[in-house]
Amino acid sequence: DINYHKPDMVFPNASTAVTEAARHKNLPMVRWLIEQGADITIADKYGDRPYTVAVQNKNQELADYLKALEPEEWHNEQEKVRQLMPYKLPAKLVEYLKTGPLRLEFPERELVKWAELYSFMDVQEMTWKRKKLLSLMVQMDNYSDYLLLWSPRDKKLWYLDIEHEEFHPLAKWDAVSYTH
């Protein structure tokens, strides 16, 4: 089954073959898998699809190719606004994700010097232990297994340490200091 995506020892996130090909920046393999019927709309445990993996990897050629094949409404701003309404995002957070800067710098920090956020259109829905959340962060300096998440339940930013399965609140968006 080309779209097999059950968690196992090799791929615990329940990703598909085409998602893994995108993760490894293998455009010829992505094309071949799609020609064989791979479904690029299947998200893994953390909400990643081949397109979002290409965005994370800054692989514009692959992202453009996959975007053209995804449902058009997934890349329509009005549809994204409608889709994210249940998450009760603060207007300031929405504006920030639309206008940036998406790279947050922490020069005074020793271990984490930066974090890069998704643009508004690329924010990902995900579920963690039956909680509906939004994944806001593409990547973070030195920590590949952390996610920055938005919880609509308490309207706070949370972080998830995937490796240790630790899920902790950080702050309300208004309490985050950032320069615009």
Task: Outline where the language-model segments fall.
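Ankyrin-repeat C-terminal turn/loop position
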Residues: 38, 70-71
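Conserved ankyrin/ankyrin-like repeat signature
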Residues: 28-29, 61-62
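Non-catalytic interaction/regulatory modules that flank or connect domains
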Residues: 84-165
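Conserved small/polar residues in nucleotide/adenosyl-binding loops
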Residues: 179-180
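Ankyrin-repeat boundary/"N-cap" motif
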Residues: 5-17, 43-49
